[in-house]
């Protein structure tokens, strides 16, 4: 145990999936932690936990935070918001119990903790109650464009990060109005994303990458990919850099 007194919360970015892309500071934090918390689907340990597998102390206490099953509820439904809010509240209190007992709790977050990371929901609930440190991680999009060897922006280019869940017309408008884009949350939205890219005249530039930097990584021109549902770890890159020096 870290000692008598209030514990410390550490949000640890685990990067895009390759364990060798963990930062030195992240590895040190794992060595200091008394408790390891991570979000996951029921019955699974999650990708973040897999990334740090070989770095954990034998006496480390693990605190998996299992998401409720909400796939049958539309995200715009009030019932979804109620269930997910209750889940994050309960997760924060589970972590707080360890912090109040003086333990250092490291919370894993795939990519970067404060960029589309579930850790954020703990951070906003606990940062005003306990000492907090956030250790940044290499983002998934950075890992993907590095894997693809795809220069994305330069000079005064604007980069837009867009969720594939947004309305098709709005997605197409934003794609037409930016020099470069990263489209996250692909999943079952792939056909819609393809149509929006075609409507904005950007389909021929788009590159699809899944599981970037992981052992089973794959990439292809989006125009050549079938409209199958994409895995969770996938995104679409649309490069800018038209006026190359």
From Swiss-Prot:
This enzyme's EC code(s): 2.1.1.130
GO terms of molecular function: precorrin-2 C20-methyltransferase activity
A matching Pfam family: TP_methylase
InterPro entries xref list: 4pyrrol_Mease (IPR000878), 4pyrrol_Methylase_sf (IPR035996), 4pyrrole_Mease_sub1 (IPR014777), 4pyrrole_Mease_sub2 (IPR014776), CobI/CbiL (IPR012382), CobI/CbiL/CobIJ_dom (IPR006364), Uropor_MeTrfase_CS (IPR003043)
CDD domains: Precorrin_2_C20_MT
Disulphide-bonded residues: none
Catalytic activity: precorrin-2 + S-adenosyl-L-methionine = precorrin-3A + S-adenosyl-L-homocysteine + H(+)
Highest taxon in the source lineage: Bacteria
Associated pathway: Cofactor biosynthesis; adenosylcobalamin biosynthesis; cob(II)yrinate a,c-diamide from precorrin-2 (aerobic route): step 1/10
PANTHER family xrefs: COBALT-PRECORRIN-2 C(20)-METHYLTRANSFERASE
Complex and partners: Homodimer.
Record-given protein name: Precorrin-2 C(20)-methyltransferase
Higher taxonomy: Bacteria, Pseudomonadati, Pseudomonadota, Alphaproteobacteria, Hyphomicrobiales
């Amino acid at each position: 145990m870290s000692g008598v007194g209030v514990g410390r919360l550490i949000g640890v970015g685990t990067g895009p999936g390759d364990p060798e892309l963990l930062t030195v500071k992240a590895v040190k934090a794992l060595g200091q932690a008394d408790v390891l918390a991570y979000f996951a689907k029921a019955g699974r340990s999650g990708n973040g936990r897999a990334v740090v597998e070989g770095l954990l102390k034998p006496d480390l206490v693990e605190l998996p935070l299992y998401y409720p099953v909400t796939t049958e509820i539309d995200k715009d439904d009030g019932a979804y918001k109620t269930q997910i809010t209750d889940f994050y509240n309960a997760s924060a209190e589970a972590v707080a119990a360890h912090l109040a007992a003086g333990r250092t709790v490291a919370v894993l977050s795939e990519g970067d903790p404060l960029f589309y990371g579930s850790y954020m929901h703990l951070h906003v609930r606990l940062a005003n109650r306990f000492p907090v440190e956030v250790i940044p991680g290499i983002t998934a999009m950075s890992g993907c464009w590095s894997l693809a060897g795809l220069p994305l922006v330069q000079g005064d280019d604007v980069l837009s990060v867009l969720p594939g869940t947004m309305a098709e017309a709005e997605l197409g408008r934003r794609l037409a109005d930016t020099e470069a884009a990263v489209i996250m949350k692909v999943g079952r939205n792939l056909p819609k994303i393809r149509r929006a890219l075609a409507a904005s005249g950007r389909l021929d530039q788009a590159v699809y990458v899944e599981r970037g930097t992981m052992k089973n990584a794959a990439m292809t021109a989006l125009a050549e990919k079938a409209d199958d549902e994409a895995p969770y770890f996938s995104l679409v890159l649309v490069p800018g850099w038209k006026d190359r020096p």
